[in-house]
Amino acid sequence: MAHVLAVYPGTFDPITLGHEDLVRRAARLFDRVIVAVAIAHHKKTLFSLDERMEMARQALADCPQVQVESFEGLVTEFTAARGGTAMVRGLRSGTDFDYEFQLAGMNRALVPGVETVFLTPASQYQFISSTLVREIGTLGGDVAQFVSPGVHERLLHKLGRTAAA
C-alpha cells in the first residue's frame, strides 16, 4: 500500500496551539505530514525562517511522522515534488473558507493531482492566529495559553520580556 503524504503550509510566525492541533489531526489521517514553513519574502516576520522551523520542530517533536521543511514559491509545486497528494488547510471561520475555497480551486488548476483537505481546529483554538498572538505579545499581553511553552519562551525573549512569576 502506498504511503500518503500531506503538506501543511504556512508562515508559522509563530506556530500556535491551533496549528499544532491541525498537524496532529492531519497526522491521524495521513501516513506522513510535512509542515512546510514559507520563506515568505513578501511578509515581514517577527521570527527568522530558522527560528520558525526550530519552534515547529520543538512543538511537534512527539509526532514521528511529521517533518518540518522550508519552501519557497508555489506550495503546490513543493507538494508535488515531494510526492504529496494533499495539502491541509485550516478553517476557523466563514471568512477563512471564502479565501481557502478560491485558493483550492486555483491550486487544483495548477496541479490537479494534489487535493486540498480542510480541517477545523478544536473549539478552544478556533480564534487563535499567529497575527493576534504577535500583536497581543507585543502589547504586553499574556499569550501563554495560545502557544506551547517553548514557543512562549522564545516569544518573550524576542520581545525582550521575561515570564511572569
Curated annotation (Swiss-Prot):
Keyword hit for Ribonucleoprotein: no
Residue stretches in coiled coil: none
E.C. designation(s): 2.7.7.3
Pathway: Cofactor biosynthesis; coenzyme A biosynthesis; CoA from (R)-pantothenate: step 4/5
Entry GO CC: cytoplasm
Annotated SUPFAM superfamilies: Nucleotidylyl transferase
Pfam families: CTP_transf_like
Location of this chain's protein in the cell: Cytoplasm
Swiss-Prot/TrEMBL site (Transition state stabilizer) positions: 19
Keywords in alphabetical order: ATP-binding, Coenzyme A biosynthesis, Cytoplasm, Magnesium, Nucleotide-binding, Nucleotidyltransferase, Transferase
Enzymatic reactions: (R)-4'-phosphopantetheine + ATP + H(+) = 3'-dephospho-CoA + diphosphate
Binding-site positions, substrate: 11, 43, 75, 89
Primary location: cytoplasm
Gene Ontology BP terms: coenzyme A biosynthetic process
Domain of life, per lineage: Bacteria
Enzyme's top EC category: transferase
UniProt key word Nucleotidyltransferase: yes
Any one GO molecular function term: pantetheine-phosphate adenylyltransferase activity
Swiss-Prot/TrEMBL cofactor(s): Mg(2+)
Positions annotated to bind ATP: 11-12, 19, 90-92, 100, 125-131
Function per UniProt: Reversibly transfers an adenylyl group from ATP to 4'-phosphopantetheine, yielding dephospho-CoA (dPCoA) and pyrophosphate.
Family indicated by similarity: Belongs to the bacterial CoaD family.
Oligomeric and partner information: Homohexamer.
Database matches in HAMAP family: PPAT_bact
Protein name: Phosphopantetheine adenylyltransferase
Organism of origin: Acidovorax ebreus (strain TPSY) (Diaphorobacter sp. (strain TPSY))
Organism placement in taxonomy: Bacteria, Pseudomonadati, Pseudomonadota, Betaproteobacteria, Burkholderiales
Gene name per UniProt: coaD
